[in-house]
Amino acid sequence: MEVQSASTKRILLVDDDKFLLDMYAIKFSKAGYEVKTADSTEGGLKLVRGGYVPDVMLCDIVMPGMDGLDLVNAIRKENLAPGAVTIMLTNQGSSDDISRAKKLGVDGYIVKATTIPSEVLAEVERIRSSKKA
C-alpha cells in the first residue's frame, strides 16, 4: 500500500460519464485533493487493489458491468480502503439504490442531476468533517 501524509486528501472518482469525471477531477484537484479516476468499476477496483488507498470514494451507481455499490462492497470486503468516506453519485434516486447504499454503510448519496461540481465538493467536505467528528 502507498504511504500518504496525514494532510493528503485522496479521492477516487468512478463514473462512466467521462465528461463528468473530468469536471469533478478538475474541481477536486483545484481543492487540493490527489485525484485518481476510473471510468469503470473494474478500473476503480484495479486502482485500489494496486495500492491506491483513497480517503474518499465518489462513485456512480449505475454503470455497465459491476455497479458502484458492488464496487464499494468489494473494496470493503477486501479491506482495501479502511475508513474511507464513501459517497454515491448517481442519476438514479431509486429507493432500492438508497436502501442498498444504507445497508452497505455508505456515508452519502448525491443525485447528480441536481448538483454542480462545487456543490458536490461542498457535500464531500461536509461528510468528511462529520465523519471525523
Predicted regions: what is each one?
Residues 60, 90:
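Active-site residues of response regulator receiver
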Residues 63:
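Receiver (REC) domain active-site loop signature in two-component systems and cognate sites
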Residues 52-58:
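Active-site beta3 strand of CheY-like receiver
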Residues 37-46, 68:
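Helix N-cap/capping motif at the beta->alpha junctions
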Residues 46, 69-82:
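Short amphipathic alpha-helix used as the core "switch/output" element in two-component signaling
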Residues 1-10, 117-133:
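Non-catalytic signal-transmission and effector/linker regions of two-component phosphorelay proteins
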Residues 22-30:
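Charged docking surfaces used in two-component/phosphorelay signaling
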Residues 70, 93-110, 114-122:
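Alpha4 helix (beta4-alpha4-beta5 surface) of REC/receiver domains from two-component response regulators
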